[in-house]
Amino acid sequence: MKIKLGVIFTCLLMMVFSAAAQQAEIDTRNPYTMVEQVGNRTFERMKNSKAQIKENPELLRTIMEEELLPYIDYQYSAFKVLGKHFDFKKADKEKLIEYIRVFRQYLITSYADALSYYDEQEVIFAPEQDFDGDKSATIRAVIRDGKRPDISVAFKVRKSGKADEWKAYDMVAEGISMLQNEIRQYEPIIRTEGIDKVI
């Protein structure tokens, strides 16, 4: 897929998903605990599968798909990249479905590729804020490894009205939005040349 998110963003995304304690189930009703729990479970499985991943790198993609992707609102992100002027009513439904499928697979690959940059850096979360009644939230954190300046990140999540659960859709690192960056880069191409250009 021609849509290419920066490696630094996917790396930071994985760092923000790290947590202090493993949980048996993910609490998607609380965006703060959801982010921490997802990361912890993902990295715990990676740690336990280190030897198998070395033998079969494709296993890392499987882990991303099973542990991380269920908590990413990839369809919402994919639609945002299409742009506000995209005419969904006139769009070829089969192409739209294929676009979402390719976008999903791209995210899996991006997260798997970025994991080689993660080296157990410390993630310090800002205190939980009241999100009662909100449909979106921004979870702020600082990534610290002692070798470089701290990196400020903000993880954006949204609440699904139907499922009543929170999912992630964007990452902002040092004021730069991963999603907005892709919208600025690809929305004009989609608008003028069509969805085929990004599949």
Residue ranges and their predicted role:
Residues 150-180:
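Short beta-strand edge/turn micro-motifs at domain boundaries
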Residues 8-16:
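Bacterial N-terminal signal peptides
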Residues 17-23:
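Sec/Tat signal peptide C-region and signal peptidase I cleavage site
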Residues 109-151:
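Surface-exposed, charged secondary-structure patches
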Residues 136, 141, 150-158, 190-199:
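A beta-rich soluble binding module of mature secreted/lumenal proteins
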Residues 25-111:
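Early exported N-terminus immediately downstream of N-terminal targeting peptides
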Residues 170-199:
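Low-complexity, intrinsically disordered terminal/linker segments enriched in charged
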Residues 1-9:
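Bacterial N-terminal signal peptides that target proteins for export
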